[in-house]
Amino acid sequence: MKYDIIGDIHGCFQEFQNLTEKLGYNWSSGLPVHPDQRKLAFVGDITDRGPHSLRMIEIVWELVIHKKEAYYAPGNHCNKLYRFFLGRNVTVAHGLETTVAEYEALPSHKQNIIKEKFITLYEQSPLYHILDEKRVIVCHAGIRQDYIGRRDKKVQTFVLYGDITGEKHADGSPVRRDWAQEYKGQAWIVYGHTPVAEPRFINQTVNIDTGAVFGGKLTGLRYPEMETISVPSSLPFVAEKFRPIS
C-alpha cells in the first residue's frame, strides 16, 4: 500500500484541496480519490485557527469512518475539541475559539451532527497508526522507539504534545526536547505538531508540519517514495511560530 501523509491542516481546507490535487487526487465526487488507490493519512490537528475546521471534520470523518479509505491520528487540538464536545471544562483559546465560533453559528441539529461525527472519529481512531508491516508510524507529535506498541498515559502525552520538559517559552508555549535526534529505530516516524519552515528529516523521522495556518505551507509526504510535496498557505506569515527546535 502507498500512502500520502498530510501535515497539520488546522482548518485550512483550500490548502488541503490544493495539496491533494497536486498529489494526484480527484475531487469530482466531493472527496479526494486517487486513481492508483493511494491512501491518505493525517497526523492530526485538522481543526482550530484556520477558517474551515468543520469542513475538515466532515471530510476526514467521511474518508476515515464512513468509507474507511484513510487514516487519522489525533493531535492535541483534536483532544481538546473532543473534550469540549463531551462538555468538559476546557479553555476556549489557542485556536479552539475559531472552531467553536463556526460550531455555534450552526443551527442546533447541524451542531449535533458535527459533534457526533467528531466524537466518533476521535473515539474510533488509535493514538497512532503502525502501517506497512511496521515500516512507518503516523502520529501527531512523534513517538520514542521504546514507546511503540504502548498506549498508556505517558505515551499518550508524548504522542499528543511531544517530549515536553515542563518549562515554558516566553509566549507560554511548552519547551520540548528534540526527541528525533535520539531516535534509533528502523521504522519511519512521520509526525507534525511543531511548525518547521521545511520538512525536517532526522534519523528515520520526518516532521511535516510546515505551518500552513501560520502562513507557511501545507506538506504531504509520499510514502514509500519519501518525497515531500507542498502548497503555499493563503494566510499571513507569522514568523515567531517557526521557532528553532531546542
Swiss-Prot record:
The reaction(s) this protein catalyses: P(1),P(4)-bis(5'-guanosyl) tetraphosphate + H2O = GMP + GTP + 2 H(+)
A UniProt-annotated Pfam family: Metallophos
One GO cellular component term: cytoplasm
Gene Ontology molecular function terms on file: bis(5'-nucleosyl)-tetraphosphatase (asymmetrical) activity; nickel cation binding; phosphatase activity
InterPro entries according to UniProt: Ap4A_hydrolase (IPR050126), Bis(5'-nucleosyl)-tetraP_PrpE (IPR023937), Calcineurin-like_PHP_ApaH (IPR004843), Metallo-depent_PP-like (IPR029052), MPP_PrpE-like (IPR041780)
Keywords: Hydrolase, Nickel
Enzyme Commission number(s) from the entry: 3.6.1.17
Cofactor annotation: Ni(2+)
Top-level enzyme category: hydrolase
Database matches in Gene3D superfamilies: 3.60.21.10
SUPFAM superfamilies: Metallo-dependent phosphatases (SSF56300)
Membership in a protein family: Belongs to the PrpE family.
PANTHER family: BIS(5'-NUCLEOSYL)-TETRAPHOSPHATASE PRPE [ASYMMETRICAL] (PTHR42850:SF7), METALLOPHOSPHOESTERASE (PTHR42850)
Purpose: Asymmetrically hydrolyzes Ap4p to yield AMP and ATP.
HAMAP family: PrpE
Protein name, as recorded: Bis(5'-nucleosyl)-tetraphosphatase PrpE [asymmetrical]
Source species of the chain: Bacillus cereus (strain B4264)
Name of the gene encoding the protein in the UniProt record: prpE
